């Protein structure tokens, strides 16, 4: 029954030194985390500022697109009534296509 037991002195635990706690490392880590928190706060502020700028640009673009889309429709309705008297303006059509 006792054949599986090792004879002689027991080997020392290899992980003995690695398992010891170092309390000084925790004290050194605290300033790093506070600096990281400050960096994260600054990054969040920058992201919020950029997001607000993009929202404003999107609103302006939507407003601009609506005004452009309404103007050609109003201009096209009037010339359709007098289509026979006026030739087609290719330059104006090219400019409108470029705006799209």
Curated annotation (Swiss-Prot):
One Pfam family per UniProt: DUF4665
Record localization: Nucleus, Nucleolus
Primary residence: nucleus
Keywords for this protein: Acetylation, Nucleus, Phosphoprotein
GO cellular component, one term: nucleolus
Claim: Nucleus is one of the keywords in the record: yes
Residue numbers bearing the Phosphoserine modification: 19, 69
InterPro entries on file: RBIS
N6-acetyllysine: modified positions: 21
Entry's transmembrane regions: none
GO biological process per UniProt: ribosome biogenesis
Subunit text: Associates with the pre-60S ribosomal particles.
Job of this protein: Trans-acting factor in ribosome biogenesis required for efficient 40S and 60S subunit production.
Protein's name in the database: Ribosomal biogenesis factor
Primary gene name: RBIS
